[in-house]
């Protein structure tokens, strides 16, 4: 298991609310909580930036973190990430924030300490551009959306 440096920015973490942890041995994501001052109403169409009370430092340029939505919030309530996916670079050290967007038809209350997103570590491969005049021919070529087959 990879060590991940973290700072607790909200003293309720570790006291009222647990540190993020994997729910099972097969879990890929660590749940992030809404460390709000009070329960907050998110109206339909509204987007709100939610603090998590944590900052992390990955440090390894071969890793990054993704902030992803929790499936239940999106499916049951229409609460998804405003930026769809949050990318945390290995050299970022600021507070993890979650952009919540209510794409549903009814207002939703985000409770203090509610699990609102998940953090997943992923490998990173950095590339450099090699400029060419032409590409080697491929089966797909320049075919865009819908060109790899139907159903």
Swiss-Prot record:
* Enzyme Commission numbers on file: 3.6.1.23
Q: What Gene Ontology molecular function terms does this protein carry? A: dUTP diphosphatase activity; magnesium ion binding
Report the catalytic activity: dUTP + H2O = dUMP + diphosphate + H(+)
Query: What is the enzyme's main class?
Result: hydrolase
Record pathway: Pyrimidine metabolism; dUMP biosynthesis; dUMP from dCTP (dUTP route): step 2/2
Q: Which UniProt keywords apply?
A: Hydrolase, Magnesium, Metal-binding, Nucleotide metabolism
InterPro entries (UniProt xref) = dUTPase, dUTPase-like, dUTPase-like_sf, dUTPase_trimeric
Cofactor(s) this protein requires: Mg(2+)
Question: Which of this chain's residues are annotated to bind substrate?
Answer: 70-72, 83, 87-89, 97
Which terms does the UniProt entry file under GO BP? Answer: dUMP biosynthetic process; dUTP catabolic process
Q: Which domain of life is it from?
A: Bacteria
The family this protein is said to belong to:
Belongs to the dUTPase family.
Q: What does this protein do?
A: This enzyme is involved in nucleotide metabolism: it produces dUMP, the immediate precursor of thymidine nucleotides and it decreases the intracellular concentration of dUTP so that uracil cannot be incorporated into DNA.
Q: Which PANTHER family does the entry mention?
A: DEOXYURIDINE 5'-TRIPHOSPHATE NUCLEOTIDOHYDROLASE (PTHR11241:SF0)
Protein's name according to its UniProt entry: Deoxyuridine 5'-triphosphate nucleotidohydrolase
